[in-house]
Design a protein with these regions (language model features):
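Short coil/turn segments that connect the beta-strands within blades of beta-propeller domains
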Residues: 102, 153-155, 199-201, 249-251, ...
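Beta-propeller blade signature
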Residues: 120-121, 172-175, 217-223, 267-271, ...
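Asp-box/WD-like beta-propeller blade repeats and closely related beta-sheet repeat scaffolds
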Residues: 128-147, 158-161, 165-207, 213-217, ...
Length: 691
């Protein structure tokens, strides 16, 4: 039943806002540092908060956390949210099985466990065998492990060890037969790619340095270690990713080079010879995503096909004139693809829902893979294995994973998240609305069946809009709680993502980024115009690049929203390029670089931190960030919190929840995930009057 403002909710709000009135945000000192960018003087009143190790900054973080908890911990709705999220998250979860040496290797988190562990299971069936347990590594469960790659024979497992949520890890090699680590680990660093040689006598890995870029190394497994050899990367800058892929037959090393999110290159090396890696695909302004099939490469690309196509390349007979198109571009964008056994599985997005088509490796159409319904599906596997995996989820269907036989099409359930949720009570509708420039944008609305718009329904609007990321339907426990309590959960598939191909992506990057914000604002206006909700009942939610989205929108149209959740955001787009200790150089190819005069103009025009105006009635805002975010600079959230607290002229609170061990790369124990998710949802429920 929807919690509309009656006596009890009204009493709840009066009490909550009374607490807000009594508890005021901590004052923050201003230092007003002035810088000039291309003739424009910019004054930063909270520049000092960029120094993360400074004692004054640490004290500021403590005071801000105390303020946020003083407002949030006592909310009556918090207890019920915590109980419900616990019920929806405390179940066995499995991720990413990979078949090697007759065993499936996978990550698993048991219902009562805090972190993911690494297991294996015989492909023919049997019990799960625990290989790597992170529990003994730290008393507070903030040290986690992750599966990197398994050798072809299944005897050696590379796994990462991560502190908190930082991107940096150690890389360990685990001897599966001896049940112990083999040799010394690679020390803590920014590793961003790993591949075993087929004979398991060594491996390739990518080592990243934020100032110098990535380099590919080869590590031989010899007694006493030895010196790792640099294989590739000289001349590439910090705005480039490099990742190795070895062919299952042991013949080839493929090197994938990615320049931001819009351009890629491929290099390869014949491992039977002694020559260095040589160019395969270079100098083309498009992406190339490869998979091996024996001596062939199947490559998904948007070259001359903005919505994607698949090419076939014979590595024994090179030359662009020899490339063959095996899957042509169509009306729907190709999201991903898999080569399993002797077949090609192509996942297209039809109005943002998955449709998986089957082809021979020469492009003959062989039918489709039936999915449980509209939602997000996908497949993965290898060309030399007849069995792959199929997954599916939707906004009202929890995640399921199936073993899939490529020869017969037979599937068997591997795992289903046992979430207690009554899917049949709810429905998902897709609507289309015009953006500012007339572009039609799709949006999913998830709510209880039979909802009649009356302008009063509490609504959360979510978006991302960037980096070619497609926001496809997936089950979200926070959204599930929201719709169970009568709300609408809305997801706008705005430009900048990959839902409709590369043109959709590029229409939301660099100097076109304002399109993303306009699309999101138009979604809010449409929801209000069509009487689904009103500004006092509307919250927006986004993280990372989506944090930039909601940060920009709240500064451009603050009157449209009651509340904002802004998770680990990018916000100071003028100084962003100066944050060299964070993983920002590739993102400059998506956002732009304020050191370049032409790009400074549009970055300065929308940069949320520079757009804050004193005396404005801003919505309630909850920021989240943490010291361990080594990808999105946390100083941005710190500075934005202080600036909005000083500027706002409304009675709605601005606060930050700052976890010193939190970052972009997960590693958070489940109890902390539930705690953080509860506080975020309680904040929105409080502001929108939901119990």
């Amino acid at each position: 039943m929807r919690a509309i403002m009656g006596c009890r909710p009204a009493f709840f709000l009066v009490c909550a806002f009374s607490v807000c009135a009594q508890v005021q945000p901590p004052a923050t000192r201003q230092d007003n540092v002035s810088e000039t960018f291309h003739g424009v003087e910019i004054v930063d009143p909270y520049h000092w908060l960029e120094d993360q190790s400074n004692g004054e900054t640490r004290a500021w973080i403590d005071r801000q956390n105390a303020y946020a908890h003083a407002l949030l911990d006592g909310l009556p709705v918090r207890v019920g949210i915590s109980q419900r999220l616990t019920a929806m998250l405390r179940h066995d979860q499995v991720g990413g099985p990979e078949l090697r040496g007759g065993y499936y290797f996978f990550e698993k988190r048991g219902a009562e466990e805090e972190l993911w562990s690494i297991y294996r299971r015989k492909a023919t069936g049997g019990p799960d065998e625990l290989l790597i347990d992170p529990a003994p590594l730290s008393a507070d469960h903030r040290t986690s492990v992750g599966m990197e790659e398994i050798s072809e024979d299944g005897n050696l497992l590379a796994y990462s060890v991560r502190q908190g949520g930082e991107d940096e890890t150690e890389i360990h090699i685990f001897d599966v037969r001896k049940r112990q680590d083999a040799g010394k680990p690679l020390p803590r660093a920014l590793y961003q790619g790993f591949a075993w040689k087929a004979d398991a006598n060594g491996f390739y890995y990518t080592l990243g340095k934020r100032d110098a870029g990535r380099r590919l190394y080869y590590h031989a497994l010899v007694p006493g270690g030895g010196t790792d050899m640099e294989v590739f990367g000289e001349g590439f800058g910090p705005d480039t990713w490099i990742a190795p892929v070895t062919s299952p037959n042991g013949h080839y090393l493929l090197i994938v080079v990615q320049h931001g999110w819009a351009k890629g290159e491929l290099y390869f090396q014949d491992l039977s010879g002694s020559g260095p890696p040589r160019p395969l695909i270079t100098g083309i302004d498009a992406r190339f995503d490869p998979q091996f099939a024996g001596d062939f490469l199947l490559v998904k690309t948007n070259w001359k096909a903005p919505k994607g196509r698949v090419l076939k390349i014979d590595l024994r007979d090179l030359g662009q004139e020899k490339w063959r198109e095996v899957v042509a571009a169509g009306d729907d964008a190709i999201d991903d693809f898999a080569v399993i056994g002797g077949k090609l599985f192509v996942n297209r997005l039809h109005n943002v829902a998955s449709r998986i088509s089957i082809y021979s490796l020469d492009g003959a159409a062989l039918g489709e893979v039936a999915l449980p319904g509209p939602g997000s599906g996908g497949m993965y596997g290898r060309a030399d294995q007849d069995e792959g995996l199929l997954y599916f989820s939707s906004y009202t269907t929890p995640y399921s994973l199936y073993r899939y036989n490529a020869s017969t099409g037979a599937r068997t359930l591997w795992h289903r998240n046992a979430v207690p949720f009554e899917s049949e009570r709810f429905e998902t509708e897709q609507v289309w609305y015009p953006s500012k420039d007339g572009t039609r944008i799709p949006m999913f609305l998830i709510h209880r069946k039979g909802l009649r718009p009356d302008g009063q329904t509490p609504t959360i609007l979510y978006g991302y809009g960037g980096f070619n990321v497609s926001i496809t339907p997936f089950f979200n426990p926070q959204a599930a709680w929201w719709i169970e309590h009568g709300g609408i959960y809305a997801v706008a598939n705005i430009r900048g993502g990959g839902e409709f191909g590369e043109e959709w992506h590029r229409a939301g990057m660099l100097d076109k980024k304002q399109n993303v914000f306009d699309d999101f604002i138009a979604a809010a206006e449409w929801l209000i115009q069509k009487r689904y909700t009103n500004p006092r009942k509307l919250a927006i939610w986004g993280g990372s690049n989506g944090g930039l989205l909601v940060g920009a929108v709240l500064t451009q149209r603050p009157e449209l929203f009651q509340a904002v959740v802004c998770w680990h955001p990018d916000l100071d787009m003028v100084r962003y390029y100066k944050y060299t200790k964070n993983n920002n150089p590739p993102a400059l190819l998506e956002y732009g670089n304020a050191a370049i005069a032409e790009q400074f103009k549009y970055l300065y025009a929308y940069s949320p931190y520079e757009r804050v105006r004193p005396g404005t009635k801003y919505p309630a805002v909850l920021f989240t960030s943490g010291d361990a975010d080594t990808r999105v600079p946390p100083e941005q959230a710190r500075k934005m919190t202080a600036r909005l607290q000083a500027a706002t002229n409304s009675d709605r609170p601005v606060m930050i929840l700052y976890d010193t061990k939190a970052g972009h790369s997960g590693g958070t124990p489940l109890s902390k995930v539930i705690e953080d998710s509860t506080l975020e949802l309680a904040f929105v429920a409080w502001q929108l009057g939901v119990q």
